[in-house]
Amino acid sequence: MSTSNAQSGRAAAIARRNAQVKGKGYTASAAPAAPRKPAAPVAEPVVAAAPAPSQPSRSRRKVSVAPTATPAASAAGREAAKLKRQQQKNGKSSAGAANAMPHPKAKAKQKPEEPIVEPRQAKAEKPTKRSERRTGVKPQVASQQPSGRLQSKAYRKAQAKGKAGQEAFKSNGSSQSGAKAKLANPDASTREIAQQVRAERCAQGKTCSTGGSRPMRKRRNAKEAPQKVGESQTLHGQSVSGTQVGQGEKKMTGSESGACQLVSGTEYLGAEEFSKNCDVQPTPQPAKVTQTQTTRGQVVSGSTKVGRSDKMTGNETGTCSAITGTEYLPADQSKMYCGETPAKSKATGFSVMSQATQKSEQKVTGGDSRKSQSTTFKPKNPASAPHKVMPSQTAKGNTTTGSQVGRLESVTGGERGSCHAVTGTGYQGAEEAKACDMPMTETADKVTASGTAGGQKVTGDRSGAYYGMTGAEAGDCKTITGTSYTGTEQFQFCSVDEQNEMKVRQRKGANPSISGVQPGPQGLTGAQKGACELVTGSHYQGGDQTAMVCDSTNAAAPGESDFPAMIGQAQPAFSTNEVEPMVDEGSKITGDGWDRGSKVTGTDGPWAAQRNASIRGVAGQSPMGASQYRPVNNEVPMSPITGSSGNTDTGAKVTLSGGARA
């Protein structure tokens, strides 16, 4: 066998393996095929006579190939495989470019063989190469593959990509028309694939159904199932929805007892129950909830019908009389029993509601009879109701809130004692005095406040002629040396001399008075030193003495610019003495290390003295305890009243300072 035959067999084996791996739709395009003639049919060599199939083998034996073509052919096969993989990776554009510019070594192999003229054929046509015939036939075979096989190939291809490929395969649908079209013709463009998918969907639908359905036998006696939720109307015309109860179509037994009887409670049977199963349709019971309309069109609903009725006696009184409050009687009552329509009362407000019985203009969907609109109109100037909580002011200016008491224009029955003053807490407002046309009587203050001569505020019950209290005039105009509790308003009942004396004897300022022998620079030698300097303790020098010795008129006061001030802002340093121990060191405690060592603390106190009472030291401490203070008695005071000046065991019972001896 020649080298060319071996190489062509090897190329055919490689192409066959590639077709098995990638499907029958794979096209062996390792080398660009030579252009065909349009008139040359592909199937012409197949129709030839019997000796025709052996003709190509003779032509291969006759053709001589140089020995140097074997490595070039193997390299061309590898290059063709690389080009094919590159085409599948890049798409159609790279495939077209690869076909346009084939490898130089591949061109050497693509030299057309010389045709052999057959004697039995009328026309000698140039036979095509084996690769060309294989290229032209394979797309036809691939197009004839069943859709199930292409579907399986597409699924295996997606499964080879992993989980992501499987999810993409499932999300794209079960038909996978695009994947099958790509497997059938790998060189097809996206436009051609889309056209094939649309054509397949037009022919078979999106679910790839063939259009033929399996014959199904029609069920015998097929009847509709009863409705789960039914709707009917009672004898009163009310809608009832839900599971229908009753005899129905004679499918339920045991419900014949009381089928044509009425119930006294809520009506739940439909009107068709009586029309189908009963000979006579009963009269419905009175409605549980009734609705009536007033003369102004307002709807009144409730379980009890108000007004006069033929079945109710005892309510004839006031049938034809009008009411001033809310109108609740029906409009037809006056026509039935009075023979005339009563006059409409003055409207203070009215509402417009759509009725439940309106069918044509009902705005509510779903079949429920609920109101669809509720609008309330109120007049512009409604009658003002009295305030529940109203503020007012008494004669003393105190504010009171709450329900107003007393005589008012809108309150009747409170005339007795309305214009009289009360002696207790004043709660009557100014509007009551206005109604009585008289000034308000001011009552006495329950708690008074006044000021003393020293500027202090005193509150509470006051005594004296000013406050209308008798028996407390003694000592009102006397000057006291203790705490002042009498207000300045009491001075107007004293004479001028008594007032002047009170002013002279009244202590002024916060400096205490100094009595006795006053030391000072007057008549005492050696006392001038430091007489004009400030002291930090108690003042013992009077102001007149200081003015006589020192020039106090020109002296600088604290806060002035020439007042001496400390230049440095450093804190004053204080000398501290060395701290001495309060308890002298005694003898050490014998025993288990109870000494004044560095490792044991707290053994020099009363606990150590209790353990060893014979060794107490120079100034031993006695143990603390409440039992030591038992023999000590508290000092009995002279009087149980404290905090007052002049508290002595002898003297008058009552002093001017306010202190009393019990």
Swiss-Prot record:
Unlike H.neapolitanus and predictions for P.marinus strain MIT 9313, this protein is not thought to have ribosomal frameshifting. Residues 141-150, 391-404, 641-650 have a biased composition (Polar residues). N-repeat repeats lie at residues 8-27, 58-72, 147-168. It comes from the Bacteria. Residues 1-258, 277-322, 342-419, 588-607, 619-662 are annotated as: Disordered. It is found in: Carboxysome. This is Carboxysome assembly protein CsoS2. It comes from Hydrogenovibrio crunogenus (strain DSM 25203 / XCL-2).
